[in-house]
Amino acid sequence: MKKNKLSKNQHRRIQAHHQYRLHPTSLTDDKNNQLDDAQFGEPQQGVVISRFGQHADVEGHQGQQQRCHIRRNVLSLVTGDRVIWRPGIPRQENRNVKGIVEAVHERKSVLTRPDFYDGIKPMAANIDQIVIVSAVIPDLSLNMIDRYLVVSESLNIKPLLLLNKIDLLTPNERKKINLRLNIYRNIHYTVLEVSAQTGEGIADLQANLLDRVSIFSGQSGVGKSSLLNTLLPPTEQQILVEALSEKSALGQHTTTTSRLYHFQQGGDLIDSPGIREFGLWHLTQEQIIQGFIEFRDYVGHCKFRDCAHIDDPCCALRDAVQKGHIAKERFDNYHQILSEITLKGKKLFNQD
C-alpha cells in the first residue's frame, strides 16, 4: 500500500520540532509533556543498540541499556544512531519501565539498500568500515566482493576485505586464491586472510577493528557467526547466540534484527540481516563506475562522451584492460552490475 507523503510544511514543522528537542531545555516544552517528565530521568547521550518496531534498545554513556519508546517526531531510527534519550524511572508497581528517545543527532554515514515497498531503506548509521567477508567455501565470488565495494565507495565508507576458512586450503590452493585477491591488493585495498577455527590472522583483524564501528557483510556460509564468536567477549557472545537460535539452528540467514555489539579489545560491530545481499538498483551509472576506483583515471578520456565502454572505438577503459592496468575480472563485473541496474530500473524506487 502506498504511503501518504508529507507536505513541505509538515516536513519543516517536524524538523524544527526535532531540532528543538536536541536541546535539554526543550524537554518540557508544553503541558502535555509534563506528564512524561515524571516518568523519565534526565536527558543524556546514547546510541541505538537495536530497533524493534516502535521501540529501540538504547545504551547510555555509562553502559546501561534500556528499551525505549520513540517520539513520533523521530522519523527515522536505526542501529548505530546517536540519540538524546531519557531513561525510564523504575516504580514499585511496574518494574518493566521503558525510556524514551527524544531526538537523533545528524548521521556521519548511513548504510541503505533498495526495497520494493519502502524505496531506499536505511539499515545502520555512523559506520566507519564495511568488512566484506568471503570464504573458500562457498566458492570465492569476486562479483559479490565488487558489489560490496561499489556500495562502500558510494557511501565513502572504508572497506576491509576478509577471506575466512583459510585452514581448508592446501598451500597450492592458497597460492591460487592469493593470485585472485591480488587484484584488490594492487588497487590498495586491505585484504586479510583468517581462520575462525585455528585463530590465524585474528590478531591482524582485531587491530583493523580497533576504535571503529564496523559492519560485517557477506554471503551465508562464509563463517561470519564463527568469526563474531571469536571476536566478541562472552557476554556479547551469549546475546549473539540467543539472537541466532531464535530463528534457526542452521546458520543461514539467522540474524533477524540489526544489533550493535562491543569488541573486548575496542571498537564496535553492527550485525545486520539486510547486509547479506545488496541490490544496487538505486545507484546511478556514475555511482557504479566511480565505485571501481581504478577506473577513475580513465573515465572521461574516451573518444566519445557517451562511450558505453563495450565495443566503442577508442575506449580508454578497454584500452587500460588490454594493457593490464585494469583487471579484466573487474571490468566484466562492472558491466554485469550495470546490466542489472538497467534491467531493474531506478524507476522502481522512490527516493523522495
Curated annotation (Swiss-Prot):
Which keywords does this Swiss-Prot/TrEMBL entry list? Answer: Cytoplasm, GTP-binding, Hydrolase, Metal-binding, Nucleotide-binding, Ribosome biogenesis, RNA-binding, rRNA-binding, Zinc
An example GO biological process term is: ribosomal small subunit biogenesis
Provide any one GO MF term from the record.
GTPase activity
The keyword DNA-binding appears for this protein:
no
Gene3D superfamilies per record:
Nucleic acid-binding proteins, P-loop containing nucleotide triphosphate hydrolases, Probable gtpase engc, domain 3
According to the UniProt record, where is the region Disordered?
Answer: 1-38
Give the cofactor note.
Binds 1 zinc ion per subunit.
Could you tell me which SUPFAM superfamilies the record lists for this protein?
A: P-loop containing nucleoside triphosphate hydrolases (SSF52540)
What's the Enzyme Commission number for this chain?
3.6.1.-
Co-factor requirement: Zn(2+)
Q: What sequence ranges are listed for the domain CP-type G?
A: 116-278
User: Which segments show compositional bias classed as Basic residues?
Assistant: 1-21
Q: Which family does it belong to?
A: Belongs to the TRAFAC class YlqF/YawG GTPase family. RsgA subfamily.
Q: Please explain the role this protein plays, according to its UniProt record.
A: One of several proteins that assist in the late maturation steps of the functional core of the 30S ribosomal subunit. Helps release RbfA from mature subunits. May play a role in the assembly of ribosomal proteins into the subunit. Circularly permuted GTPase that catalyzes slow GTP hydrolysis, GTPase activity is stimulated by the 30S ribosomal subunit.
The name of this protein is Small ribosomal subunit biogenesis GTPase RsgA
Q: Which organism is it from?
A: Hamiltonella defensa subsp. Acyrthosiphon pisum (strain 5AT)
